Regions:
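Metalloprotease/metallohydrolase-associated module, dominated by Zn2+-dependent proteases
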Residues: 47, 166-217
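Post-HEXXH active-site segment of zinc metalloproteases
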Residues: 143-173, 177
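A short, mixed-charge helix-start or loop-turn motif at secondary-structure junctions
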Residues: 38-39, 62-63, 177-184, 238
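Extracytoplasmic and endomembrane cell-envelope/extracellular-matrix remodeling and assembly machinery
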Residues: 39-46, 75, 196, 201, ...
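Peri-catalytic and regulatory segments of divalent metal-dependent proteins
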Residues: 26-135, 139-152, 205-206, 225-233, ...
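N-terminal signal peptide c-region/cleavage motif recognized by signal peptidases
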Residues: 19-20
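Bacterial N-terminal signal peptides that target proteins for export
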Residues: 1-10
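Hydrophobic helical h-region of N-terminal Sec-dependent signal peptides
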Residues: 11-16
Length: 267
């Protein structure tokens, strides 16, 4: 069906090119090339997606300071995530980036990356809730859909490139463009709420107090509200693409209250 649509598009372009003498300078070769690229983008396969995700996370690991295996941050994360093998069949792997930004993300291949500055402000249970939220996006395939959209609107906006039948490696410029697109990507409010719910249940299954979801969001809100702080500006940029934190906090608090779960005493 997609091939038929593509052929119709090419035929339409050919007809349009010869429909008027006034269009004599219409570049038919360029138009058909653009149609080919568009068709390639639309037919991006799961295998191609996997290759691009692998290339992206490899690039990210190379362009950020990854904490060593014996680093305190790594040891803490390893202890927290011990026994977490997969997310709905997708194998998980974890690393810590030693960076100033407060963030965490998960890729479609199950690669979860936690920033050291986030670990600095979160308790173990709060951090586990955030990780659960990110894993929720992987399990629900939000990460895959978001990556595909970012890929096609940034690094592959001109179509899928290939060399000798294989995908061409993305350039540093393309990977940088992809990173920016992913940072600015927006999950729907429904996707974010479902990921929050996943994180909530994730904490319960781990034997932790699910109130930690609300508490982790509360900490992020407090940081977000700090004025004149470079960290705050980065958080404002980050959460401009997320549903309102107050609403998310309220949802998690109501969820825990309705289940009769006591709010932990904050020391």
């Amino acid at each position: 069906m997609k091939n038929k649509k593509f052929l119709k598009l090419v035929v339409l372009l050919v007809c349009f090119a010869f429909s008027s003498h006034a269009m004599a300078q219409f570049d038919l070769k360029k138009a058909i090339s653009g149609a080919v690229k568009m068709a390639q983008a639309v037919t991006l396969t799961d295998e191609q997606m996997s290759e691009y995700v692998k290339e992206y996370i490899t690039w990210m690991d190379a362009h950020n300071q990854v904490c060593a295996d014996d680093n305190a941050y790594t040891l803490r994360l390893k202890k927290l995530t011990e026994g977490l093998g997969d997310a709905d069949g997708i194998p998980l792997n974890f690393k810590v980036y030693y960076v100033k930004d407060v963030n965490a993300f998960a890729c479609a291949d199950g690669s979860v990356r936690v920033f050291s500055s986030l670990m600095d402000i979160m308790s173990d249970e709060e951090l586990l809730g955030v990780i659960g939220h990110e894993i929720g996006h992987v399990a629900h395939r939000d990460s895959k859909k978001g990556f595909r959209t970012a890929l096609l609107t940034s690094a592959l906006k001109d179509g899928v490139a290939s060399q000798g039948g294989k995908l061409a490696e993305l350039t540093d410029s393309q990977l940088g463009s992809l990173t920016e697109a992913l940072v600015n990507a927006r999950y729907s409010q429904k996707q974010e709420c479902e990921a929050d719910d996943y994180g909530y249940e994730f904490l319960k299954k781990a034997g932790k107090n699910p109130w930690s979801m609300a508490l982790s969001f509360q900490k992020l809100k407090e940081l977000q509200g700090q004025s004149g702080d470079q960290l705050s500006s980065k958080l404002n940029q980050l959460f401009s693409t997320h549903p309102d934190l107050d609403l998310r906090i309220k949802r998690m608090e109501e969820h825990a209250t309705n289940e009769g779960i006591e709010k932990p005493v904050i020391k």
